[in-house]
């Protein structure tokens, strides 16, 4: 793979991204779709997939931090971009001039943002967060919270674009708590409307709610993990969306050696050969996002067969046992995440080994790993981050 700076890469199929987004569009109808591209689009590369998302159903984007928004604006993305998290007030001018929509959950912050905007002769675009039960950020949906939001809505330098909350259990089979959260948001919005405040974009549905709870769609929805082809949990109704993972993580064999019986592999001597063995070294390790927790537990796909990761995963390398596979040589392609010939080892499988979720697996793929983008099975772009 000589178009990369190293023999480790992630392939992202833009056709699959497009199809996933079309599936979401078909499910939610004419509702606004806010495609969440934070954390480098969950490891898929925000700069290089944003246009595909927007061309196939998304009307807006959401990120977590201002540098993610700036990156998209600098790349020529003109669609509305929302920041879901905190932005220090010293970035106010940047927010306002680039028309980046900031989440607000503090009155004093909103006042400062309004003052900055007035000095620039503009308005700061904001979304107001309501904490209906996530316990993270947002105004509480009580009388005090209502008065604070009414005060923000009266500020001369802000334009309130949206009102939103975040569901904490929408991907679970029991939807009771999600319905409680939704009821709190809708009641809060009604109280605002009773006070003459009509916010144009109400949004609450995340991936789990998009799949299972169409009654929570409101004016728009926020899709994250489902855009990339993974379900938020095993408890959602998968039949509602036909998704396919868009990312495959690959490498090439860097070295092949034969070891006699009773020889050790990697740090700590945790693996000892039980017979004469053929061991292949792969040039990927935990600095690339291939976790040390996979040591002795993960599988890879090589030459249409599974091979086990043996010994401890190192910072930049790991080893696999290929004794049972014929003619393995330097340069052979290896799939670390993905599928081939009916064999599959994906982010769900890796997450189960590590005791985490598929989201984290995808986000762990580091900037040391180049991204290769394909359309119609042809490479259309390569992104080497470093």
UniProtKB/Swiss-Prot annotation:
For this protein, the record's Gene3D superfamilies field holds: Alanine racemase, Lyase, Ornithine Decarboxylase, Chain A, domain 1
Organism, as annotated: Clostridium perfringens (strain 13 / Type A)
Q: What is its EC number?
A: 5.1.1.1
HAMAP family named among the record's database cross-references: Ala_racemase
Listed binding positions for substrate are 136, 315
Keywords from the UniProt entry: Isomerase, Pyridoxal phosphate
Q: Where is the active site?
A: 38 (proton acceptor), 267 (proton acceptor)
Record's protein name: Alanine racemase
């Amino acid at each position: 793979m000589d178009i990369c700076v190293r023999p480790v890469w992630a392939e992202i199929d833009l056709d699959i991204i497009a199809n996933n987004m079309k599936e979401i569009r078909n499910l939610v109808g004419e509702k606004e779709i806010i495609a969440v591209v934070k954390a480098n689009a969950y490891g898929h590369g925000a700069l290089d997939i944003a246009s595909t998302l927007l061309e196939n159903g998304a009307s807006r984007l959401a990120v977590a931090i201002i540098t993610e928004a700036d990156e998209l604006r600098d790349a020529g993305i003109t669609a509305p971009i929302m920041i879901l998290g905190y932005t220090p007030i010293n970035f106010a001018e940047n927010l306002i001039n680039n028309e980046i929509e900031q989440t607000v959950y503090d009155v004093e912050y909103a006042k400062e943002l309004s003052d900055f905007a007035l000095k620039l002769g503009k308005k700061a675009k904001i979304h107001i967060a309501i904490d209906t039960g996530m316990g993270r950020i947002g105004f509480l949906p009580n009388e005090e919270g209502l008065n604070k939001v009414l005060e923000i809505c009266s500020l001369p330098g802000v334009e309130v674009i949206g009102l939103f909350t975040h569901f904490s259990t929408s991907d679970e089979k029991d939807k009771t708590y999600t319905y409680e959260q939704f009821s709190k948001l809708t009641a809060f919005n009604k109280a605002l409307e009773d006070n003459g405040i009509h916010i144009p974009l109400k949004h609450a549905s995340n991936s789990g709610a998009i799949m299972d709870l169409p009654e929570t769609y409101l004016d728009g929805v926020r899709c994250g993990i489902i855009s990339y082809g993974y379900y938020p949990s095993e408890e959602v109704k998968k039949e509602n969306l036909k998704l396919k993972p868009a990312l495959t993580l690959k490498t090439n064999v860097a070295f092949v050696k034969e070891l006699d019986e009773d020889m050790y592999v990697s740090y700590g001597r945790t693996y000892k050969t039980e017979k004469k063995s053929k061991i292949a070294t792969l040039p990927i390790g935990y600095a690339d996002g291939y976790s040390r927790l996979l040591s002795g537990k993960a599988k890879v796909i090589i030459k249409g067969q599974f091979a086990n990761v043996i010994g401890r995963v190192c910072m930049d390398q790991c080893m696999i046992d290929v004794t049972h596979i014929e003619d393995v040589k330097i340069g052979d392609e290896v799939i670390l995440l993905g599928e081939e010939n009916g064999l599959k080892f994906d982010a769900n499988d890796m997450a189960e080994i590590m005791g985490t979720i598929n989201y984290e697996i995808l986000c762990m793929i580091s900037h040391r790993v180049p991204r290769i983008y394909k359309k119609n099975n042809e490479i259309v772009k390569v992104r080497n981050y470093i």
